[in-house]
Protein backbone atom coordinates (compact mmCIF):
# COMPACT_ATOMS: atom_id res chain seq x y z
CA UNK A 1 0.00 0.00 0.00
CA UNK A 2 2.73 2.47 0.92
CA UNK A 3 6.46 3.08 0.85
CA UNK A 4 6.37 4.86 4.22
CA UNK A 5 3.93 5.21 7.10
CA UNK A 6 3.39 8.83 6.03
CA UNK A 7 2.29 7.63 2.58
CA UNK A 8 -0.29 5.38 4.20
CA UNK A 9 -1.66 8.15 6.39
CA UNK A 10 -2.01 10.36 3.32
CA UNK A 11 -3.95 7.63 1.48
CA UNK A 12 -6.31 7.20 4.45
CA UNK A 13 -6.90 10.95 4.57
CA UNK A 14 -7.50 11.16 0.81
CA UNK A 15 -9.96 8.26 0.88
CA UNK A 16 -11.89 9.85 3.74
CA UNK A 17 -11.96 13.29 2.12
CA UNK A 18 -13.00 12.07 -1.32
CA UNK A 19 -15.50 9.48 -0.03
CA UNK A 20 -14.33 7.21 -2.84
CA UNK A 21 -14.33 3.42 -2.65
CA UNK A 22 -10.78 2.31 -1.89
CA UNK A 23 -9.70 -1.32 -1.68
CA UNK A 24 -6.14 -2.16 -0.66
CA UNK A 25 -4.61 -5.01 -2.63
CA UNK A 26 -3.47 -7.54 -0.03
CA UNK A 27 -5.83 -10.27 -1.18
CA UNK A 28 -5.73 -12.58 1.85
CA UNK A 29 -8.82 -10.81 3.19
CA UNK A 30 -10.76 -12.29 0.26
CA UNK A 31 -9.55 -15.85 0.84
CA UNK A 32 -12.32 -18.45 1.19
CA UNK A 33 -9.95 -20.54 3.32
CA UNK A 34 -9.32 -17.69 5.75
CA UNK A 35 -13.04 -16.93 5.87
CA UNK A 36 -13.66 -20.52 7.01
CA UNK A 37 -10.81 -20.32 9.53
CA UNK A 38 -12.30 -17.07 10.84
CA UNK A 39 -15.58 -18.87 11.51
CA UNK A 40 -13.72 -21.38 13.67
CA UNK A 41 -11.83 -18.61 15.46
CA UNK A 42 -14.95 -16.50 16.03
CA UNK A 43 -16.70 -19.51 17.57
CA UNK A 44 -14.28 -19.26 20.48
CA UNK A 45 -12.60 -22.54 19.59
CA UNK A 46 -9.14 -21.52 20.82
CA UNK A 47 -10.36 -19.28 23.64
CA UNK A 48 -8.54 -16.03 24.34
CA UNK A 49 -5.85 -15.31 21.76
CA UNK A 50 -2.52 -15.66 23.57
CA UNK A 51 0.06 -15.53 20.78
CA UNK A 52 0.55 -15.79 17.01
CA UNK A 53 3.32 -17.18 14.80
CA UNK A 54 3.65 -16.30 11.10
CA UNK A 55 6.25 -17.73 8.72
CA UNK A 56 7.15 -18.03 5.05
CA UNK A 57 10.32 -18.92 3.17
CA UNK A 58 11.60 -18.90 -0.41
CA UNK A 59 14.77 -20.36 -1.91
CA UNK A 60 15.19 -19.35 -5.55
CA UNK A 61 16.40 -16.28 -7.49
CA UNK A 62 12.94 -15.28 -8.68
CA UNK A 63 11.59 -15.53 -5.14
CA UNK A 64 14.45 -13.26 -4.08
CA UNK A 65 13.45 -10.71 -6.79
CA UNK A 66 16.42 -11.31 -9.09
CA UNK A 67 14.11 -10.54 -12.00
CA UNK A 68 15.53 -10.04 -15.51
CA UNK A 69 15.00 -6.53 -16.89
CA UNK A 70 13.01 -6.29 -20.15
CA UNK A 71 15.31 -6.74 -23.18
CA UNK A 72 16.17 -3.44 -24.80
CA UNK A 73 14.97 -1.28 -21.91
CA UNK A 74 16.70 2.09 -22.30
CA UNK A 75 16.22 5.79 -21.52
CA UNK A 76 14.96 6.22 -25.09
CA UNK A 77 11.90 4.05 -24.42
CA UNK A 78 11.47 4.47 -20.67
CA UNK A 79 10.83 7.61 -18.58
CA UNK A 80 13.41 6.95 -15.87
CA UNK A 81 12.96 10.25 -14.01
CA UNK A 82 9.22 9.73 -13.68
CA UNK A 83 9.80 6.18 -12.45
CA UNK A 84 12.21 7.45 -9.78
CA UNK A 85 9.67 9.99 -8.58
CA UNK A 86 10.74 11.26 -5.17
CA UNK A 87 13.40 8.57 -4.74
CA UNK A 88 17.08 9.62 -4.79
CA UNK A 89 18.24 10.46 -8.30
CA UNK A 90 20.66 8.05 -9.97
CA UNK A 91 21.70 7.17 -13.53
CA UNK A 92 19.42 4.86 -15.50
CA UNK A 93 19.84 1.26 -14.34
CA UNK A 94 17.66 -1.56 -15.72
CA UNK A 95 18.62 -3.81 -12.79
CA UNK A 96 17.30 -1.29 -10.29
CA UNK A 97 14.08 -1.06 -12.32
CA UNK A 98 13.54 -4.83 -12.38
CA UNK A 99 14.69 -5.57 -8.83
CA UNK A 100 13.39 -2.49 -7.03
CA UNK A 101 12.23 -4.49 -4.02
CA UNK A 102 15.88 -5.11 -3.10
CA UNK A 103 16.54 -1.50 -2.06
CA UNK A 104 14.89 0.56 0.65
CA UNK A 105 15.05 3.66 -1.55
CA UNK A 106 12.42 2.10 -3.85
CA UNK A 107 10.77 -0.79 -2.02
CA UNK A 108 10.08 -2.31 1.37
CA UNK A 109 11.80 -5.70 1.06
CA UNK A 110 10.37 -8.94 2.38
CA UNK A 111 8.26 -7.00 4.86
CA UNK A 112 6.34 -5.13 2.17
CA UNK A 113 6.26 -8.07 -0.26
CA UNK A 114 5.51 -11.04 2.01
CA UNK A 115 4.98 -10.00 5.62
CA UNK A 116 2.02 -7.81 4.72
CA UNK A 117 0.07 -10.82 3.43
CA UNK A 118 0.72 -12.80 6.60
CA UNK A 119 -0.14 -9.85 8.84
CA UNK A 120 -3.29 -8.84 6.96
CA UNK A 121 -4.48 -12.46 6.94
CA UNK A 122 -3.89 -12.74 10.68
CA UNK A 123 -5.69 -9.45 11.27
CA UNK A 124 -8.66 -10.63 9.20
CA UNK A 125 -9.02 -13.94 11.04
CA UNK A 126 -8.51 -12.50 14.52
CA UNK A 127 -10.62 -9.39 13.96
CA UNK A 128 -7.75 -6.95 14.50
CA UNK A 129 -7.77 -3.51 12.90
CA UNK A 130 -4.87 -1.65 14.46
CA UNK A 131 -1.14 -1.30 14.07
CA UNK A 132 1.08 -3.08 16.59
CA UNK A 133 2.01 -0.97 19.59
CA UNK A 134 5.67 -2.07 19.54
CA UNK A 135 8.06 -3.95 17.26
CA UNK A 136 11.56 -5.36 17.31
CA UNK A 137 13.37 -6.99 14.40
CA UNK A 138 16.60 -8.67 13.41
CA UNK A 139 18.03 -10.42 10.36
CA UNK A 140 20.48 -9.59 7.63
CA UNK A 141 21.67 -10.11 4.07
CA UNK A 142 22.93 -13.67 4.34
CA UNK A 143 22.07 -15.38 1.04
CA UNK A 144 21.62 -12.88 -1.78
CA UNK A 145 24.73 -10.72 -1.59
CA UNK A 146 24.04 -8.92 -4.85
CA UNK A 147 24.27 -5.31 -3.72
CA UNK A 148 20.82 -5.07 -2.15
CA UNK A 149 20.35 -3.25 1.14
CA UNK A 150 17.08 -4.89 2.25
CA UNK A 151 17.46 -8.05 4.37
CA UNK A 152 16.82 -11.48 2.90
CA UNK A 153 16.39 -12.86 6.42
CA UNK A 154 13.95 -10.85 8.53
CA UNK A 155 12.56 -11.84 11.92
CA UNK A 156 10.15 -9.55 13.79
CA UNK A 157 8.19 -9.55 17.03
CA UNK A 158 5.13 -7.32 17.36
CA UNK A 159 2.84 -6.52 20.25
CA UNK A 160 -0.87 -6.15 19.54
CA UNK A 161 -2.11 -5.15 22.97
CA UNK A 162 -1.05 -8.06 25.15
CA UNK A 163 -0.69 -10.47 22.21
CA UNK A 164 2.85 -11.12 20.89
CA UNK A 165 3.09 -11.88 17.17
CA UNK A 166 6.28 -13.51 15.88
CA UNK A 167 7.10 -13.34 12.15
CA UNK A 168 9.85 -15.28 10.35
CA UNK A 169 10.69 -14.51 6.73
CA UNK A 170 13.59 -15.96 4.77
CA UNK A 171 14.72 -15.95 1.15
CA UNK A 172 17.29 -18.67 1.86
CA UNK A 173 15.17 -21.72 2.73
CA UNK A 174 11.88 -22.86 1.21
CA UNK A 175 9.21 -23.20 3.89
CA UNK A 176 5.44 -23.30 3.56
CA UNK A 177 3.32 -20.30 4.45
CA UNK A 178 2.04 -20.78 7.99
CA UNK A 179 -0.17 -18.91 10.45
CA UNK A 180 -0.59 -20.25 13.99
CA UNK A 181 -3.13 -18.72 16.36
CA UNK A 182 -2.75 -20.10 19.87
CA UNK A 183 -5.08 -20.00 22.85
CA UNK A 184 -5.71 -21.99 26.05
CA UNK A 185 -8.48 -24.02 24.41
CA UNK A 186 -6.66 -24.98 21.23
CA UNK A 187 -4.45 -24.29 18.24
CA UNK A 188 -5.57 -23.03 14.83
CA UNK A 189 -2.89 -23.66 12.20
CA UNK A 190 -3.50 -22.20 8.73
CA UNK A 191 -1.47 -23.23 5.69
CA UNK A 192 -1.74 -22.28 2.02
CA UNK A 193 -4.44 -24.82 1.08
CA UNK A 194 -5.83 -26.05 4.40
CA UNK A 195 -6.07 -25.43 8.11
CA UNK A 196 -6.12 -27.60 11.22
CA UNK A 197 -7.80 -26.99 14.55
CA UNK A 198 -6.88 -29.12 17.57
CA UNK A 199 -8.58 -28.54 20.91
CA UNK A 200 -6.69 -28.56 24.18
CA UNK A 201 -8.08 -28.92 27.68
CA UNK A 202 -5.27 -27.11 29.46
CA UNK A 203 -5.28 -29.21 32.63
CA UNK A 204 -3.15 -31.96 34.14
CA UNK A 205 -4.17 -35.46 33.06
CA UNK A 206 -1.98 -37.22 35.64
CA UNK A 207 -0.47 -36.42 39.03
CA UNK A 208 2.38 -33.92 38.86
CA UNK A 209 5.83 -35.40 38.30
CA UNK A 210 7.00 -33.03 41.02
CA UNK A 211 5.85 -35.65 43.54
CA UNK A 212 8.85 -37.81 42.66
CA UNK A 213 10.77 -35.85 45.28
CA UNK A 214 8.19 -36.56 47.99
CA UNK A 215 8.79 -39.22 50.65
CA UNK A 216 7.07 -42.46 49.63
CA UNK A 217 4.13 -42.17 52.02
CA UNK A 218 3.47 -38.55 51.06
CA UNK A 219 3.69 -39.36 47.35
CA UNK A 220 1.20 -42.21 47.79
CA UNK A 221 -1.23 -39.96 49.66
CA UNK A 222 -0.92 -37.18 47.09
CA UNK A 223 -1.47 -39.50 44.11
CA UNK A 224 -4.41 -41.28 45.74
CA UNK A 225 -6.10 -37.98 46.55
CA UNK A 226 -5.35 -36.62 43.08
CA UNK A 227 -7.02 -39.56 41.32
CA UNK A 228 -10.07 -39.32 43.60
CA UNK A 229 -10.46 -35.65 42.76
CA UNK A 230 -9.58 -35.63 39.05
CA UNK A 231 -10.24 -39.02 37.43
CA UNK A 232 -13.33 -38.81 35.19
CA UNK A 233 -16.21 -41.20 35.54
CA UNK A 234 -16.24 -44.10 33.07
CA UNK A 235 -17.12 -42.82 29.61
CA UNK A 236 -16.69 -39.18 30.64
CA UNK A 237 -13.02 -38.70 29.79
CA UNK A 238 -11.85 -35.78 27.67
CA UNK A 239 -11.47 -36.47 23.97
CA UNK A 240 -9.55 -33.87 21.99
CA UNK A 241 -11.51 -32.39 19.10
CA UNK A 242 -9.66 -32.06 15.81
CA UNK A 243 -10.71 -30.50 12.53
CA UNK A 244 -8.91 -30.48 9.20
CA UNK A 245 -10.37 -28.30 6.47
CA UNK A 246 -9.01 -28.49 2.94
CA UNK A 247 -10.36 -25.99 0.49
CA UNK A 248 -10.47 -26.33 -3.29
CA UNK A 249 -7.74 -24.84 -5.43
CA UNK A 250 -8.50 -21.17 -5.00
CA UNK A 251 -7.15 -17.86 -6.27
CA UNK A 252 -8.04 -15.11 -3.82
CA UNK A 253 -6.95 -12.33 -6.20
CA UNK A 254 -9.99 -12.57 -8.50
CA UNK A 255 -12.59 -12.36 -5.69
CA UNK A 256 -10.61 -9.51 -4.15
CA UNK A 257 -10.96 -7.57 -7.39
CA UNK A 258 -14.61 -8.56 -7.65
CA UNK A 259 -15.28 -7.32 -4.12
CA UNK A 260 -13.89 -3.93 -5.10
CA UNK A 261 -16.00 -3.73 -8.27
CA UNK A 262 -19.12 -4.76 -6.36
CA UNK A 263 -18.42 -2.07 -3.76
CA UNK A 264 -18.08 0.54 -6.50
CA UNK A 265 -21.42 -0.58 -7.95
CA UNK A 266 -23.35 -0.93 -4.67
CA UNK A 267 -21.41 1.37 -2.30
CA UNK A 268 -21.19 -1.48 0.21
CA UNK A 269 -18.01 -1.64 2.34
CA UNK A 270 -14.97 -3.36 0.86
CA UNK A 271 -13.22 -6.19 2.70
CA UNK A 272 -10.04 -4.14 3.11
CA UNK A 273 -10.37 -0.39 3.25
CA UNK A 274 -7.57 2.16 3.50
CA UNK A 275 -7.55 2.13 7.31
CA UNK A 276 -7.16 -1.66 7.51
CA UNK A 277 -4.49 -1.64 4.81
CA UNK A 278 -2.63 1.19 6.52
CA UNK A 279 -2.57 -0.72 9.81
CA UNK A 280 -1.24 -3.86 8.10
CA UNK A 281 1.40 -1.87 6.24
CA UNK A 282 2.37 -0.05 9.43
CA UNK A 283 3.54 -3.34 10.94
CA UNK A 284 5.82 -3.86 7.94
CA UNK A 285 7.22 -0.34 8.16
CA UNK A 286 7.85 -0.87 11.87
CA UNK A 287 9.68 -4.13 11.16
CA UNK A 288 11.92 -2.35 8.65
CA UNK A 289 12.54 0.61 10.93
CA UNK A 290 13.38 -1.69 13.85
CA UNK A 291 15.78 -3.65 11.64
CA UNK A 292 17.67 -0.61 10.38
CA UNK A 293 17.67 1.22 13.71
CA UNK A 294 18.60 -1.95 15.61
CA UNK A 295 16.18 -0.96 18.35
CA UNK A 296 12.62 -1.27 19.57
CA UNK A 297 10.14 1.01 17.81
CA UNK A 298 6.64 2.09 18.82
CA UNK A 299 3.56 3.24 16.94
CA UNK A 300 1.85 6.56 17.62
CA UNK A 301 -1.71 6.13 16.36
CA UNK A 302 -2.58 9.80 16.88
CA UNK A 303 0.03 10.90 14.33
CA UNK A 304 0.49 7.65 12.34
CA UNK A 305 4.22 7.81 12.99
CA UNK A 306 6.89 5.36 14.10
CA UNK A 307 8.95 6.34 17.11
CA UNK A 308 12.06 4.79 18.57
Region annotations inferred by a language model:
Residues 1-30, 44, 294:
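Beta-strand-loop-alpha-helix segment that lines the small-molecule cofactor/substrate pocket
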Residues 13-20, 36-50, 68-74:
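Basic phosphate/pyrophosphate-binding loop/patch that engages nucleotide-derived ligands
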Residues 20, 64-67, 99-108, 241-242:
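Flexible glycine/proline-enriched surface loops and loop-helix/loop-strand junctions
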Residues 24-26, 70, 105-112, 140-145, ...:
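Active-site rim elements
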Residues 146, 157-251:
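NAD(P)-dinucleotide binding in Rossmann-like oxidoreductases
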Residues 54-97, 199-231:
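Core domains of carbohydrate- and sulfate-ester-processing enzymes
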Residues 81-164, 171-174, 275:
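Rossmann-like dinucleotide-binding domain that binds NAD(P)(H)
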Amino acid sequence: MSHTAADGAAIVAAAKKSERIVQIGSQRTSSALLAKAKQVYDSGAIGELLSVELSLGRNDPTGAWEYPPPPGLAPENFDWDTWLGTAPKKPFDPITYARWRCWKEYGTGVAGDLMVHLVSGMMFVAGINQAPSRAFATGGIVRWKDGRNMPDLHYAIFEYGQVPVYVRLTLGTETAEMTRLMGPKGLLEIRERDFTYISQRGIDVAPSYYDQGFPTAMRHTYETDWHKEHDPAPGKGFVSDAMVYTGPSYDDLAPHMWNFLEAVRTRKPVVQDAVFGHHAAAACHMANQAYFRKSLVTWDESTSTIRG
